[in-house]
């Protein structure tokens, strides 16, 4: 809480108009590959198991585009449900601590669907739509001035944009305030993890 408070104060003192919380509470040193961008969201959800057997792990390590992770954040083994995911509480904390308008961020359904292993759904698109349903339910409860969906994997996979946009739009449609989408190439710790284009 103190670190979050310091981030907010620093941003306000710097004169920013829209304040975020820095996401420091999401970081897990056990999973530095994605700075808490994945595990924070899927860990509390139902239908995803954290431990994989040797065969499941080997299959994941063959998955194209996941070389930046040593193991998946989990394997989908049943229908994805909200579980104990609670984005409203950290959003409220941000709103309570800030004196200016705030932006709350959440990892998007495409990114989440690309990083998990799967033994339940028929396609990555189906996984993305299941994540979109959970995230839409969470987004509907948020009172931030701007709610941003972070999609760090999509620019490297433009061939998936059609179904990714359906999932992203499902979340955007649930946002009661202003929605935004942030695309990037996932440049964690100065290491580019995929190639792509902004075209």
Show where each model-derived region lies:
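Domain-level signal for soluble alpha/beta catalytic cores
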Residues: 1-199
């Amino acid at each position: 809480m103190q670190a979050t408070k310091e981030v907010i104060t620093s941003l306000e003192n710097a004169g920013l108009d829209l304040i975020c919380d820095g996401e420091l509470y999401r970081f897990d040193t056990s999973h530095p590959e994605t700075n808490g961008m994945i595990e924070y969201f899927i860990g509390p959800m139902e239908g995803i198991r954290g431990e994989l057997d040797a065969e499941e792990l080997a299959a994941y390590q063959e998955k194209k585009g996941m070389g930046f992770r040593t193991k998946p954040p989990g394997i989908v083994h049943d229908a994805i449900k909200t579980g104990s995911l609670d984005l409203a509480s950290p959003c409220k904390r941000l709103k309570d601590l800030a004196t200016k308008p705030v932006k709350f961020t959440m990892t998007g359904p495409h990114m989440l669907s690309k990083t998990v292993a799967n033994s339940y759904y028929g396609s990555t698109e189906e996984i993305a739509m299941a994540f979109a349903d959970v995230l839409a339910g969470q987004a509907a409860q948020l009172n931030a001035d701007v709610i941003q969906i972070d999609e760090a994997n999509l620019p490297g996979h433009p061939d998936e944009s059609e179904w990714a946009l359906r999932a992203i739009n499902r979340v955007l449609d649930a946002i009661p305030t202003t929605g935004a989408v942030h695309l990037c190439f996932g440049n964690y710790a100065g290491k580019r993890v995929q190639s792509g284009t902004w075209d």
